A protein has these predicted regions:
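Short, well-ordered loop/turn sites that connect or cap secondary structure elements
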Residues: 47-50, 283, 376, 401
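Short, solvent-exposed secondary-structure boundary/capping segments
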Residues: 72-86, 170, 311-323, 356-360, ...
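Glycine-rich, acidic and aromatic/proline-enriched surface loops and short helix-turn segments
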Residues: 87-89, 104-125, 247-258, 351-379, ...
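Structural signature for extended repeat/solenoid scaffolds and their inter-repeat hinge/linker regions
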Residues: 161, 172, 289, 343-616, ...
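Acidic, low-complexity/disordered segments
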Residues: 285-287, 292, 296-346, 420-428, ...
């Protein structure tokens, strides 16, 4: 059969095109491109040609694309010449970039959203695995195409295009079963280049290439919500070289094991390749064919085309291809870099009406200034951890950034999907707590409450150094052992309500080494209750002044010892009352004196003196209602001095 090539151009927006030359390049997970030179018998209007479809059909094999470039070349003879660069619709994503946040979506859902937002629908997902939800995924300063590419690579999803006249479809998959055979006859003969006529649609040269690759993959990661979990995954063999990146990009062990398994396939996919030339126009990236009639029978197997370039020079057509055994599980390499994030700032956001919006881990949400889609509420970001000066199991420092504060956001390993708040900064809306530069010597911590603030403030101004503390409401201090306070000058306590001091067990000592002590109760009472013994020792004078009544009540004995004199002076009546016996004893003389009457009244009254008893008055009367006895054991003398009168109903003298 003669070696003839038929090429046809179909473009709804451009008529009368005749192909002159054509070159195309395509690869798995690569953007295909085609350059077509054409002639027309009449001039074309190129202004509306961009982004319109053009299909190049080479020997019944279609290559469809959108015109990305249109060039008007110098005319030759009666023909106008043009050149068109064709690209797939996916290439248009390289023309747009974005900064946005995706939350709680799988990689497939994110990619579909990007496609939808760009207005493209010609794609098919043939994914067997189920990509997990991503709590937080950031697109930052990268084209939509690069963003989509790296997400697909992270999930081990490869992609290629299928073509027909007027349409090309993006196929996204993660298993070799998604690769279709080439169009037409899937068996392609090996027919080495030779003179004379030859059959078209055959492989003209084929070269087997083997290369060393890593035979194993291992990686680790860290999940702060399960900090003790051993997140380590490994697959393949160490002896052939082990690829060991960190972090691995997984948060669960099962996820890591699955990732390691397909990462090994991605490493091994390039180990064995068939590189050749053919004039089979049906060869296309992502399609497989069966090689036949090769002298090396081991090569007569199914081959998957991973890259191919077609070339038509106006007379002759040929292509160059690279293929791997179809039986080799194919996964893409991770070649699209993640943006490396540097430190940024953001505003803390949360639910409307709240002052603080946080969770059990003290995380907050933020709105980045570049995020045009965020609503500055609790949906603007994922929960971001907040770095503190100290953290531990139930201890450490805790300061939760409030809604409206500007925070400094870093990214662990520069990963846009791993933000971490490392601090807070002031701005034009959030002023410092101590106005500057007037208070440049002041520093401290000042919080904010609905009605005021709590504060710990330091002032290092010379000769005015100060440490000030304020509790907006209650203040609690707990000391589990000793507490010692040393004050080198004055101390002032002012309590506007109650004050209670309790010493549960032990002693209390108050020592005033020099000076006076005054307790002034301006209004109210003073109560002292001692349930055991109380001692008061005053080495100098003590004076009591009571403006009203004073009452002492003693349930036991009452003893008053005075080394000097005791004077009791009462403006009114002095009453001494004993429920039993009243004893008055004097070591020397006992004097009882009254300016009026002095009365002794009792059932029996005895006056006894060891030496003599003298009763002296102007008149002394001894009167008994029954019997009055005057008796002396030895001698009794009754002397009237002047007159002695003894009177009775009967008087006996014996």
């Amino acid at each position: 059969m003669p070696n003839t090539t038929i090429i046809k151009l179909t473009a709804p927006a451009l008529t009368g095109l005749t192909a002159a030359t054509a070159q195309t390049e395509s690869a798995l997970n690569g953007l295909p491109t085609a350059t077509v030179a054409a002639t027309t018998s009449a001039p074309l209007t190129l202004d509306t040609a961009l982004a319109t479809r053009l299909t190049a059909t080479i020997n019944n094999t279609d290559y469809d694309g959108l015109i990305a470039e249109a060039h008007q070349l110098p005319a030759t003879g009666n023909a106008d010449r043009y050149q068109f660069v064709l690209r797939p619709w996916l290439w248009w994503l390289t023309l747009s970039s974005n900064n946005r946040v995706f939350q709680n979506l799988s990689a497939q859902e994110i990619v579909e959203k990007v496609f939808k937002d760009a207005g493209f629908i010609d794609y098919q997902f043939k994914v067997k695995s189920k990509p997990g939800k991503r709590e937080y995924c950031l697109q930052y300063n990268e084209s939509d195409f690069n963003f989509v590419s790296r997400l697909l690579e992270q999930e081990g999803i490869f992609w290629f295009f299928t073509h027909k006249e007027g349409k090309h479809t993006l196929v996204l998959a993660d298993d070799n079963s998604a690769f279709p055979p080439i169009t037409g006859e899937k068996k392609v003969k090996y027919q080495a280049a030779q003179s004379g006529e030859r059959e078209t649609g055959a492989v003209r040269s084929a070269e087997l290439r083997l290369q060393a690759t890593s035979q194993g993959f291992q990686s680790s990661d860290y999940n702060y919500e399960q900090p003790k979990a051993a997140l380590f995954a490994q697959a393949g063999e160490k002896k052939g070289g082990m690829h060991s990146p960190h972090p691995g990009g997984f948060s669960e062990k099962a996820q890591g094991d699955a990732l390691a398994a397909w990462k090994v396939n991605a490493l091994k996919a390039q180990a064995k390749q068939l590189v050749g030339e053919s004039d089979c126009a049906a060869l296309a990236a992502g399609h497989w064919f069966t090689l036949t009639d090769h002298d090396d029978k081991a090569l007569n197997i199914d081959w998957l085309v991973i890259a191919v370039s077609h070339e038509y020079d106006g007379e002759r057509y040929r292509n160059r291809f690279t293929a791997i055994p179809k039986a080799t599980p194919y996964r893409p390499q991770s070649s699209t870099p993640k943006p490396f994030m540097h430190t940024q700032t953001a505003l803390v956001v949360g639910k409307s009406g709240e002052e603080v919006w946080t969770d059990k881990l003290g995380r907050v949400k933020v709105q980045f200034p570049w995020d045009r889609e965020g609503k500055s509420d609790e949906t603007s970001s994922c929960w971001l951890r907040v770095a503190t000066a100290w953290s531990g199991n139930g201890f450490g420092a805790q300061f939760i950034p409030r809604i409206g504060q500007e925070v400094v956001v870093s990214f662990i390993d520069g990963d846009p999907d791993k933000p971490l708040i490392t601090g807070c900064v002031y701005n034009g809306a959030n002023a410092l707590p101590y106005a500057l530069p007037a208070n440049q010597t002041q520093s401290g911590i000042k919080t904010k409450s609905e009605k005021g603030f709590n504060e710990l403030r330091f002032d290092d101004k010379k000769d005015a150094e100060l440490l000030a503390m304020q509790a907006q409401k209650d203040f609690q201090l707990a000391v589990l052992n000793d507490s010692k306070t040393t004050i080198s000058h004055d101390e002032i306590h002012s309590v506007k309500n109650d004050r209670t001091r309790t010493v549960e067990e032990g002693n209390e000592t108050v020592t005033l080494k020099k000076g006076n002590r005054t307790v002034n109760i301006e209004k109210g009472s003073d109560t002292l209750e001692v349930k055991d013994k109380r001692s008061v020792s005053v080495k100098g004078d003590q004076e009591y002044s009571v403006g009203g009544d004073e009452t002492h009540k003693v349930k036991g004995d009452y003893t008053l010892n005075v080394d000097g004199n005791l004077t009791i002076k009462v403006s009114g009546t002095l009453t001494l009352e004993s429920g039993k016996t009243l004893n008055v004893k004097s070591g020397a003389a006992l004097n009882a004196s009254a300016t009026s009457d002095l009365k002794l009244n009792g059932t029996n009254i005895a006056s006894e003196a060891k030496a003599s008893l003298t009763q002296k008055a102007a008149t002394i009367t001894h009167e008994a209602k029954a019997t009055l006895t005057s008796k002396a054991s030895a001698t009794q003398t009754v002397d009237g001095g002047g007159m002695l009168t003894i009177k009775g109903g009967m008087v006996k003298i014996n």
